[in-house]
Amino acid sequence: MIAHLRGELVTAGADWVVIDVAGVGYRCLVPASTRSRLPAQGAAVQLYTYLQVREDALTLYGFLTQAEYDLFELLLRVDGVGPKVALAVLSTTDPAAFRRAVAFEDLDAICRVPGIGRKTAQRLVLELKDKIGAVPAGGGGVPDGLPVAVAPAGDAWAEASEALIALGYSRGEAAAALARVRAEAGEAPSVETLVRLALKQLYRG
């Protein structure tokens, strides 16, 4: 079992990274929450990792925080929930907010995650409510939807997110699309560039 990787960030795509550890490059699939907070290429980085073993493939998933890793692993224990849905959860919300949604049986909030319908949301609540532990501090009420993963810093990113929301996309969809275009957008993109690139991602589904 590969528990974590610590090394140099070699390259990164929309939902994956390659980390060089002692001359060996490890390719990890990552959620938007991790992708949007990665350092620059060439910098040192550490990811908590989950290795999925199948007959035809070995797939490594990486997360910046232990909380993200723990939630990913917990989600995979739910019948019918695979890595794709688990990554979608972490790409559109933070672990504490998702745990609150489960604790308060907020099905509407859970269903806002791409790939999760009503039946899956009900199954998540049924199977996870007794496993998530105490509701995190500050979770005194039912959340008004799930807060999205932190977007890259900069006013242009925030303005682009609001522009996408104004076009009818959810806050989670906007955050996930913007996270996927970070590498392509460059260091100081304009709002127009960010919106255009994000819309391409959203149109692709």
From Swiss-Prot:
SUPFAM superfamilies: DNA helicase RuvA subunit, C-terminal domain, Nucleic acid-binding proteins, RuvA domain 2-like. InterPro entries: DNA_helicase_Holl-junc_RuvA_I, Hlx-hairpin-Hlx_DNA-bd_motif, NA-bd_OB-fold, RuvA, RuvA_2-like, RuvA_C, RuvA_C_sf. GO terms for cellular component: cytoplasm; Holliday junction helicase complex; Holliday junction resolvase complex. Keywords: Cytoplasm, DNA damage, DNA recombination, DNA repair, DNA-binding. The keyword DNA repair applies. CDD domains: UBA_RuvA_C. Signal peptide: none annotated. It comes from the Bacteria. GO terms for molecular function: ATP binding; four-way junction DNA binding; four-way junction helicase activity. It is found in: Cytoplasm. Residues 65-143 are annotated as: Domain II. This is Holliday junction branch migration complex subunit RuvA. It comes from Symbiobacterium thermophilum (strain DSM 24528 / JCM 14929 / IAM 14863 / T).
